Amino acid sequence: MASLKKSLFLVLFLGLLSLSICEEQKRENEEDAEDENHEEESEEKRGLLDFAKHVIGIASKLGKRSEEKRFWPFMGKRSEEKRFWPFMGKRSEEKRFFRVLAKLGKLAK
């Protein structure tokens, strides 16, 4: 009877040991799967953030270009600034004024 008890305890112990090892491996596999899912989600978020940064960068460049047009003559100017750049075009009052100056200059010679 004693040998039967020993063998029964031995089988029970080995069965519980293998069961605990299997459960531990299962938990590790589940944690790995969760980590992979989390990494995939974070990669998707990173991809969306990169795309959003790209779109914002393009939008800001477009905004800068419209602002630069106000200040750079080769890109075009606002009509208020054109009056200060004679080669870009003059307002009608300035055209009249320059004609008068030209006539006065001819008379002075």
UniProtKB/Swiss-Prot annotation:
Report the leader peptide range: 1-22
Q: In which tissues is it expressed?
A: Expressed by the skin glands.
Biological process (GO) annotations held by this record are: defense response to Gram-positive bacterium
| PTM-bearing positions, type Leucine amide | L62
| Pfam families tied to this protein | FSAP_sig_propep
Residues annotated as transmembrane: none
List, as start-end ranges, the regions of compositional bias called Acidic residues. Answer: 30-42
Chain positions with Methionine amide modification: M75, M88
Q: What is this protein called?
A: Preprofallaxidin-8
